[in-house]
Structure formats: C-alpha cells, structure tokens
Amino acid sequence: MPEQNATAPQWLSPVEMKAWRSYIIASRHLLEALDNDLEGHDLSMPDYEILAQLSDAPERRLRMSELAEITLLSRSRLSHRMKVMEKAGWVKREACPSDKRGFFAVMTPKGWKAIVAAAPDHVASVRSHFVDHLSNQEQVVLAGIFSRIEESFRCEVIEG
C-alpha cells in the first residue's frame, strides 16, 4: 500500500476490506442465484422487480419515470426491459392523458399470471439463499445497516 500523505486516499483497513469484499461477493452470488431461480419462469430479476412493483401499484400501473426511480433502472434500461416484457405480453405502455410525453407501464393479465406463478419460487429462493442464513436479530441489524446506507443515497439525490 502506498505511503499516506495529505492527498493520498484513505485506504481501507483489513476489517473494512473484509467487510466490503464479503458484501460484494455475497451480493453478486445472491443476485445470480435469484436470477437463476427465476429462469424456470422465463423471468430475470429486473423483470420480476418490475412486475412486483406494478403488482403493488394502484390499478397495476405506474408512470415510467416513477418505475425507473423505484427500480433504480436508468430510463433507457427500463425502456429496454419494457420492450422485452411487452413482447412477452406481461406489460404494456399507455400514454398519459395529462402529459403528452409521459407513459404508464401497465401490468397485463398475463403479467399478473407470471408474477403469481413465480412469486412462491422467488420467496423460497430468497429464504434459502438469504433469510435462512441469518438469525432474526441479524436480520434486524442488517435491515438497519442497509436502511442507513439507502438513506444516504436518498440524501445525495435530494441535495444533488
């Protein structure tokens, strides 16, 4: 590691590095496993997340801009996913009557059937790859940690 000076980066300590690397590796494995477990339903994790958000929304519809924000997808990435999902018949886009440039993402009955079919397997996957490895106390601590980190990003967006 380079010598420390006023302009040198503050390198991670061994404990910090272990925590960081463990998080990165575990999260990549977790997302890959969840994605693989959805393959039997012809869904990807982003598809599932989009359908899950739409299934919870009033009338199973959200403005595209709101859906992009909720799912943390760029507008272009969401647009690409929507094209794939429209082709599969899970969603459709509808023009927003109050905003000529705006569109709604709307879940179709086929999309509803897809998420209803996939949800039990997805929950089982989340349990086996994540929840079952943590005690209730660890789940509470982890939720607190990631809520704090998530909040720091929200503050950056508001301030930025």
What would you call each of these model-derived segments?
Residues 1-41, 140:
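N-terminal leader segment of winged-helix/HTH proteins
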Residues 1-14, 136-160:
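C-terminal regulatory/oligomerization modules of transcriptional regulators
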Residues 5-7, 83-144:
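Charged, amphipathic alpha-helical coiled-coil/dimerization segments
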Residues 18, 22, 49-53, 113:
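Pre-recognition alpha-helix immediately N-terminal to the DNA-recognition helix
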Residues 24, 52-59, 119, 147:
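Short, locally clustered residues in the helix-turn-helix/winged-helix DNA-binding domain
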Residues 28-76, 158-160:
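N-terminal helix-turn-helix DNA-binding core of bacterial DNA-binding proteins
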Residues 64, 82-83:
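Short, hydrophobic-biased segments on the C-terminal half of alpha helices
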